[in-house]
Amino acid sequence: MKIPLIYNRILILFFFIANIIILDQVSKKWIINNLLLHEKKPLISIMNIFYVRNYGTAFNFFSNNPGEKNYILCLISSIAILIILKTMYNNTTIENFFYNIPSAFIISGAIGNFIDRCYLGYVIDFIDFHINNWHFATFNIADVSIFIGSVLFIYHNKYFLKN
């Protein structure tokens, strides 16, 4: 029996999303098992591995009073994830399939951080870029995935949706 093309596209996106989530979760598990909280290991001159817990959102916004707010963030995240998944499912035609690639990056990162936030109460961050004493916000692979997806969305909308 031949599988319809729409299911092949959905399967490709599913495996893409699953692999990014697995990479994110495995990297965070490695950090937990190999570093102490706030321990820093230099990798290269401008990058450290630095284990921190982010009780807030991006760039540690809303990080004070993590208790109740965590449930609200989990609820908001789950609603956003469902909306993106529904949008992706509706865009499985060949014309719209490449629109789903940025969505796949974003949904992967959202799910990776959602898992941390809902099961641990915080997100594990560990990538620390710096120049001398100036440090960018510490982040993780899920955050990188969200960033890549956002850049791809901007690129797609700027160069492919001119009509």
Curated annotation (Swiss-Prot):
Its EC number is 3.4.23.36. Pathway: Protein modification; lipoprotein biosynthesis (signal peptide cleavage). It is an enzyme of class 3 (hydrolase). It catalyses: Release of signal peptides from bacterial membrane prolipoproteins. Hydrolyzes -Xaa-Yaa-Zaa-|-(S,diacylglyceryl)Cys-, in which Xaa is hydrophobic (preferably Leu), and Yaa (Ala or Ser) and Zaa (Gly or Ala) have small, neutral side chains. It is found in: Cell membrane. GO terms for biological process: proteolysis. The active site is at D125, D143. This is Lipoprotein signal peptidase. The gene is lspA.
